[in-house]
């Protein structure tokens, strides 16, 4: 308790921490908690199981409590608010709502970006909520640009999310990253007219007075949102005309210039030249902290930690809410209406509630992105930027929004780019460094070579069910086609997984498969061996964890594995991201992950203090054809086995290349073992070894002593000689004096 109190943690939280047997803070907690309590933005990276959740939860809970306590006692902070009223009073491009390399002339109408690699955008100072309106844009050079309309929620990269409508110089219209042919190309000296009919919900454009026809119908979710003139440039220059000057091509059919729009139709931008300041009015659906997680399991795990840490906090009590998919929204809305202080959720459901106004972000003091690299890899960068833009940068009591980003690695380009965009001079707390394999983890590769191991030919129909990628192919023995070898690999991997379990008498292991259907097929094969979910204690008792299983089943399966009711957890990479499972003795990679960082996440699950951990990867020596769904259903009911480049949903998976990339990433050679999966035993301590990597990486005490023994003997001889010389020199002067 004293250790946490010394960092400034309040006694109530320290008491709860002590009951959890956390006697001392972990390294990541010791570094991060004081920084967050001090009001800073923090970027943190540490190993799974290092106490990372506590590192951000403890200070967030404390500051939220202190904020509520101040409000309860009527204390108010002072916020200095500047306004850009002079800018917002006229129609022009907004200098406070633009990209970092977007320049605006003194008239507010001439715009330029000379960045040649990145797009930079800008919105106008005013938007519209009603009526029929028009403005013109003239192209001053041959650079790339898109012009159009967007809401305040939209990204400045116009047309790449569901809140903006753009028309580009390449003759493409764009909305929600959908780029379709429209109209015709435009370039230097062309004038583009931008039409907006809010009453009908129509957006269209013209080129040099030529009407190009309807471009977009405004979707229902945007009917009540103000739309602002917007553009995005790459090495280009534009000049806007909102109607203060005479139009080159005046509009017809009742469209009026933006500058002539009635004041009742016009709204001013929220970007006013200083940080947006939160309103002081209490709202029950406006939390003080928002924690975003990439998966349901992680969100539930974090919420449980929050409940534990706040156990002794009272007057006022903190109210928390879990917002995830797969749960009735009405239950979550009911809790929101009664008031919440801390929200933990996943992007999908959070986005729904924020976009419909059910979840209000105007009071948020903390934005926490846990497993940020996972969120970005799942395509949630637009969501993150959108919610960050909606959160006031200054709270009603004058405090600054704090952003905390947790990531498995801070060496990801996407994470660095995100931090530069949404964080304010963040402190980096990197206790993980570049990826490496702990000394307690032995990892080996088992080559799966269907050309040398012909077992797959002799199994008949008793083998594992495969993923039906080759349902229409001739894969019978003798075909000697890539498809035949690919199907053989799938069959052999099922056999090798069973063989590994039997050979090492595995009592507990996590088994990673590449896809959800692979997980289901392996579970079914274990059931054929007599195991399965309902066979407690059986050699092949197992449960599955992946996105297609219902939330309550996923939660139940995770708990059953943790309690030891079943031996094996068969899962996709969802379990490799932060879920509180570590210290298992074995991991089996049925297929290598396509991201090398995920390999380290997977095998990092193994190892205990009293026994070394063993990670076995089954690596195909030939290419395997696998599912890679790019269809709208994301694989549900899809049987399109054509290759991705041919409009299908499959790819050829090259595990040997992936293995090479992993070895290069870790700067080591991973030892290979024979298909019998017998791993060599170290003579000194009886633990498994993984050969060359062990020798290179150190940690083998006996081998280390053998190597150093001759050097130590030589040093001992030199030491003896030096001391003898010193003694000889000490007596020599006395002997010389006596001779005289």
Swiss-Prot record:
Phosphorylated by ATM kinase; phosphorylation is increased in response to ionizing radiation (IR). GO terms for cellular component: cleavage body; cytoplasm; cytoplasmic stress granule; cytosol; mitochondrion; nucleolus; nucleus; tRNA-splicing ligase complex. Its EC number is 3.6.4.13. Residues 1-525 are annotated as: Necessary for interaction with RELA. ATP binds at residues 46-53. PROSITE patterns: B302_SPRY, HELICASE_ATP_BIND_1, HELICASE_CTER, Q_MOTIF. Residues 70-247 form the B30.2/SPRY domain. Pfam families: DEAD, Helicase_C, SPRY. Residues 2-428 form the Helicase ATP-binding domain. It is found in: Nucleus; Cytoplasm; Cytoplasmic granule; Cytoplasm, Cytosol. Belongs to the DEAD box helicase family. DDX1 subfamily. Acts as an ATP-dependent RNA helicase, able to unwind both RNA-RNA and RNA-DNA duplexes. Possesses 5' single-stranded RNA overhang nuclease activity. Possesses ATPase activity on various RNA, but not DNA polynucleotides. May play a role in RNA clearance at DNA double-strand breaks (DSBs), thereby facilitating the template-guided repair of transcriptionally active regions of the genome. Together with RELA, acts as a coactivator to enhance NF-kappa-B-mediated transcriptional activation. Acts as a positive transcriptional regulator of cyclin CCND2 expression. This is ATP-dependent RNA helicase DDX1. It comes from Bos taurus (Bovine). The gene is DDX1.
């Amino acid at each position: 308790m004293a250790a946490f109190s010394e960092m400034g943690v309040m006694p109530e939280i320290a008491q709860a921490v002590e009951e959890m047997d956390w006697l001392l803070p972990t390294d990541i907690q010791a570094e991060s908690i004081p920084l967050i309590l001090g009001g800073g933005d923090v970027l943190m990276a540490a190993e799974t199981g290092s106490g990372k959740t506590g590192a951000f939860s403890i200070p967030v809970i404390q500051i939220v409590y202190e904020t509520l306590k101040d409000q309860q006692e009527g204390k108010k902070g002072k916020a200095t608010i500047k306004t850009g009223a002079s800018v917002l009073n006229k129609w022009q491009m907004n200098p406070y709502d633009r990209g970092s390399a977007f320049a605006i002339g003194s008239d507010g109408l001439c715009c330029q970006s000379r960045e040649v690699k990145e797009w930079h955008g800008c919105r106008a100072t005013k938007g519209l909520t009603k009526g029929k309106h028009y403005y013109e844009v003239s192209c001053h050079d041959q650079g790339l640009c898109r012009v159009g309309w967007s809401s305040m929620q939209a990204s400045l990269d116009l047309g790449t999310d569901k809140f903006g409508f753009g028309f580009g110089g390449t003759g493409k219209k764009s909305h929600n990253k959908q780029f379709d042919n429209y109209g015709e190309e435009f370039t230097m000296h062309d004038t583009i007219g931008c039409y907006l009919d809010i009453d009908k919900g129509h957006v269209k454009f013209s080129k040099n007075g030529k009407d190009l026809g309807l471009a977009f119908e405004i979707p229902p979710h945007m009917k009540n949102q103000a739309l602002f003139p917007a553009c995005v440039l790459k090495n280009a220059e534009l000049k806007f005309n909102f109607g203060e000057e005479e139009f080159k091509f005046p509009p017809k059919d009742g469209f009026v210039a933006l500058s002539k729009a009635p004041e009742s139709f016009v709204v001013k931008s929220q970007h006013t030249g200083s940080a947006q300041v939160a309103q002081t009015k209490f709202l029950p659906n406006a939390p003080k902290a928002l924690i975003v997680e990439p998966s349901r399991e992680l969100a539930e795990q974090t919420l449980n930690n929050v409940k534990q840490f706040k156990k002794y906090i009272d007057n006022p009590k903190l109210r928390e809410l879990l917002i995830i998919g797969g749960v009735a929204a009405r239950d979550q809305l009911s809790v929101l209406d009664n008031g919440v202080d801390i929200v933990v959720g996943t992007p999908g459901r959070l986005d729904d509630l924020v976009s419909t106004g059910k979840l209000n972000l105007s009071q948020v003091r903390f934005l926490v992105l846990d497993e940020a690299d996972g969120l970005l890899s799942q395509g949630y960068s637009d969501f993150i930027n959108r919610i960050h833009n909606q959160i006031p940068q200054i709270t009603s009591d004058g405090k600054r929004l704090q952003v905390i980003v947790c990531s498995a690695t801070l060496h990801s380009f996407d994470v660095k780019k995100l931090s530069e965009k949404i964080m304010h001079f963040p402190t980096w707390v990197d206790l993980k460094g570049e990826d490496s394999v702990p000394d307690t983890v032995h990892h080996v590769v088992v080559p799966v070579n269907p050309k040398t191991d012909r077992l797959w030919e002799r199994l008949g129909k008793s083998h594992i069910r495969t993923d039906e990628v080759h349902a229409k192919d001739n894969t019978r023995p003798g075909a000697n086609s890539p498809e035949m070898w690919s199907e053989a690999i799938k069959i052999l991997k099922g056999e090798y997984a069973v063989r590994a379990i039997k050979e090492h008498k595995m009592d507990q292991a996590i088994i990673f498969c590449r896809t959800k259907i692979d997980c289901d097929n392996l579970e079914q094969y274990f059931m054929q061996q007599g195991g399965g979910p309902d066979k407690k204690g059986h050699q092949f008792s197992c449960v599955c964890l992946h996105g297609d299983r219902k939330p309550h089943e996923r939660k139940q399966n995770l708990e059953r594995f943790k309690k030891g009711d079943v031996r094996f957890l068969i899962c996709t990479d969802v379990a490799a991201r932060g879920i509180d499972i570590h210290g298992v003795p074995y991991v089996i990679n049925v297929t290598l992950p396509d991201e090398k960082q995920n390999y380290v996440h997977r095998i990092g699950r193994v190892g205990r203090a009293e026994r070394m951990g063993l990670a076995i990867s089954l690596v195909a020596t030939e290419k395997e054809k696998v599912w890679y769904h790019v269809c709208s259903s994301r694989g549900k009911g899809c049987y399109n086995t054509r290759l991705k480049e041919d409009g299908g949903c499959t790819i050829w998976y090259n595990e040997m290349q992936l293995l090479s990339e992993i070895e290069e990433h870790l700067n080591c050679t991973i030892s290979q073992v024979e298909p019998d999966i017998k791993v060599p035993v170290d003579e000194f301590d009886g633990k498994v070894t993984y050969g060359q990597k062990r020798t290179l990486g150190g940690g083998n005490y006996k081998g280390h002593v053998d190597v150093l023994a001759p050097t130590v003997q030589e040093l001992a001889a030199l030491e003896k000689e030096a001391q003898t010389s010193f003694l000889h020199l000490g007596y020599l002067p006395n002997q010389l004096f006596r001779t005289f």
